[in-house]
């Protein structure tokens, strides 16, 4: 049952504020003061969520964030399928991040596509003392020999590379010239940079600008035959096929997708992007930088879209169509009408089973708000949400378009805080990452992994909404929960038995 149906908004707000104070009591005074700035209760009418964000995590806490290398290699560059991405530094960073994201792609692995392969080398202490450029040259030569159909290479720097000052830019230029002008992109994404993976996104965007788009501009040759309806999908990483289910809708409404990146993206699509008429941006946090650059440099407008759940899909299709003529606007309405029977069937089947169920979210820099509409389409209520690496403009978007009055907001929440919030608010479902998954399942509550869809998906588009609804129902209403109870539900049952 929805909390709002049994408590007034004022009561919910007061309860959540009291909960925040209770959680902060365990900290030393200075730490409590710092963490208090990241925890708040949303108040309707405010322009943002009232929390500080994009600030260094407190040393010693179990933060859930990643590093700049993760943001660049793991998020932005890694899914570009026809380029080889080198983890430049000690073996651990590449090994322990290998295959952690489900970036689907079309191609033959090891021949013309390399997403699920890991390229690194035996970087040792002597390389830190004497420099790693010689080994970098060697691995570049080996890649050229072993994988001759690669269309480009990126060098993703790990922490030691920035500390010892290896000149990866000079190596990149020299080897590019040696290989006949092959695209080789040095990326200064050392993990110590910034406060989270967010700076890695920005660094990766800047590398696209400096080493891809600037070269395309200098070349001056057209990459595609232009049409009035050319668009690019940016910031969809094709987790479980998300970008494909989004692309279907755009093409059905009459648009031509000339570039899709990073998920299932290629170097040729990156180069063609500068000739599009509109950039359609999914993950604002990781790709707004390059979208803004293309608007300033090439005059290409951009707009955000959200294809989670039918309400937001329809809203986004109409927003995108607004940049084009009546043909595309009519196409958008036609697509919405076409899929309405599917939407009706999904809601008729799953909403009665999920109505009033409560959810708490904690994801990266986008989904903590984007998926809220899909839950609401199923009659569910998000009672708490926050970002690992969101910025203030993310919380502004969250406050203005997604969360309700009284929602608990938690930025850069650590393991202790998140567990206490869940214990007290007792949601029917928690949606977060792989590090949190088993903690909450062991606590006896349903959980969905909202970074990679728990090996399901896609969740984007109308087809994805059906899968999303099925997965949420499967998590919450699984028969296994009849065999075990969350501690707070056991306590409630004991109280009822005592009262009888």
From Swiss-Prot:
Q: What does this protein do?
A: This molybdenum-iron protein is part of the nitrogenase complex that catalyzes the key enzymatic reactions in nitrogen fixation.
Sequence positions that bind [7Fe-Mo-9S-C-homocitryl] cluster: 283, 451
Q: What is this protein called?
A: Nitrogenase molybdenum-iron protein alpha chain
> Which family is annotated?
Belongs to the NifD/NifK/NifE/NifN family.
Q: What class of enzyme is it?
A: oxidoreductase
Read off the PROSITE patterns from this record: NITROGENASE_1_1 (PS00699), NITROGENASE_1_2 (PS00090)
Query: Short name of one Pfam family for this protein?
Result: Oxidored_nitro
PANTHER family attached here? NITROGENASE MOLYBDENUM-IRON PROTEIN ALPHA CHAIN
**Source organism:** Rhizobium sp. cowpea (strain IRc78)
Q: Which GO molecular function entries does the Swiss-Prot or TrEMBL record give?
A: ATP binding; iron-sulfur cluster binding; metal ion binding; nitrogenase activity
Q: What residues bind [8Fe-7S] cluster, as annotated?
A: 67, 93, 159
Instruction: Recite the UniProt cofactor note for this protein.
Output: Binds 1 [8Fe-7S] cluster per heterodimer.
């Amino acid at each position: 049952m929805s909390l709002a149906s049994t408590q007034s908004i004022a009561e919910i707000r007061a309860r959540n504020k009291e909960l925040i104070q209770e959680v902060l009591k365990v900290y030393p005074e200075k730490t409590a003061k710092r963490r208090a700035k990241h925890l708040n209760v949303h108040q309707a009418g405010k322009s943002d969520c009232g929390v500080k964000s994009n600030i260094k995590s407190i040393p010693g806490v179990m933060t859930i964030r990643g590093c700049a290398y993760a943001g660049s290699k793991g998020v932005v560059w890694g899914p570009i399928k026809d380029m080889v991405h080198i983890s430049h530094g000690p073996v651990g960073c590449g090994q322990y991040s290998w295959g952690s994201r489900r970036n689907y792609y079309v191609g033959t692995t090891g021949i013309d596509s390399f997403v699920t392969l890991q390229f690194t080398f035996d970087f040792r202490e002597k390389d830190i003392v004497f420099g790693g450029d010689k080994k970098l040259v060697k691995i570049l030569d080996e890649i050229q020999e072993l994988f001759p159909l690669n269309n480009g290479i990126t060098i993703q720097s790990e922490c030691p590379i920035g500390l010892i000052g290896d000149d990866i830019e000079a190596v990149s230029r020299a080897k590019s010239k040696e290989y006949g002008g092959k695209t080789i992109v040095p990326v200064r994404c050392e993990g110590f940079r910034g406060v989270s993976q967010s700076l890695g996104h920005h660094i990766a965007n800047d590398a696209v600008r400096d080493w891809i788009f600037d070269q395309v501009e200098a070349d001056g040759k057209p990459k595609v035959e232009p049409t009035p309806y050319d668009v690019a999908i940016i910031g969809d990483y094709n987790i479980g096929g998300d970008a494909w289910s989004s692309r279907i809708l755009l093409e059905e409404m009459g648009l031509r997708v000339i570039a899709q990146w990073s998920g299932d993206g290629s170097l040729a699509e990156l180069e063609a992007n500068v000739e599009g008429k509109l950039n359609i941006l999914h993950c604002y946090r990781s790709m707004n930088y390059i979208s803004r650059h293309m608007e300033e440099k090439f005059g290409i407008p951009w707009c955000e879209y959200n294809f989670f759940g039918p309400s937001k899909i329809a809203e986004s299709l109409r927003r995108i169509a607004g940049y084009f003529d009546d043909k595309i606007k009519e196409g958008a309405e036609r697509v919405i009408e076409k899929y309405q029977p599917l939407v009706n069937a999904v809601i008729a089947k799953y909403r009665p089973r999920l109505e009033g169920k409560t959810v708490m979210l904690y994801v990266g820099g986008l989904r903590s708000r984007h998926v809220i509409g899909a839950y609401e389409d199923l009659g569910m209520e998000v009672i708490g949400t926050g970002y690992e690496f969101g910025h203030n403009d993310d919380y502004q978007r969250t406050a203005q378009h997604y969360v309700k009055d009284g929602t608990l907001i938690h930025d850069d929440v650590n393991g202790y805080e998140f567990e206490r919030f869940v214990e007290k608010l007792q949601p029917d479902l928690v949606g977060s990452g792989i590090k949190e998954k088993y903690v909450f399942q062991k606590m006896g509550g349903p959980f969905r992994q909202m970074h990679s869809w728990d090996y399901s998906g896609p969740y984007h588009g109308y087809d994805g909404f059906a899968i999303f609804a099925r997965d949420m129902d499967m998590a919450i209403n699984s028969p296994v929960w009849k065999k075990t109870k969350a501690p707070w539900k056991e306590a409630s049952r004991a109280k009822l038995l005592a009262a009888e």
